[in-house]
Amino acid sequence: MDLSIKSPLAFLDFTTQNFDPHGDIHMLAVSKHATIMAARLGLSAAEIEWIEVGAKYHDIGKLFIPESIRRFPGLFTPVEQLVMQQHCQIGAQMLQLLGLPAPVVAIALNHQENYDGSGYPSALRGRNIPIGARIVRIVDSFDAVTHDRGYRHACSKKRALEKLHERSTHYDPDLLDLFETLIHETWDAVPGK
């Protein structure tokens, strides 16, 4: 790893571990599975590293969302939803200010974009969404539904995969197929059967 980005990453690690220990677990899980997907796709070592880092810090902008919204135990009002959606731009700006590479910044900015163009912040569609963000979109969704939230209980891995397929237009179909293959290959190693 480039030494010029090690200090900013150490800062981000310290910040997330002390600010939101449960979020840190999510970030590590998303990073691990996104990295496995990137490697399976045969991406370059640099691309894999960017995806590993971008996946880990994809939600870093949530640190600047009011706690009353971040930890709200129910569904958001339209205004709360708009505030929460700002985490993508805030996170991207933060990573950019810390000097992280553009592909890492792009993951934070675009990880809520949907393959069908219905996502945010820019309503990108298809392959206009960077590959790292398309990978993180899938892995993040899976990890989110396999863990308890204030407004719902965790799903089994089987049910989580069904949920991804119910919203399949949100995800790159080739990457979704790869993810499902990888989950089945590593079924016993993934928490929350």
Predicted region positions:
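Histidine- and acidic-residue-rich, metal-dependent catalytic cores
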Residues: 2-193
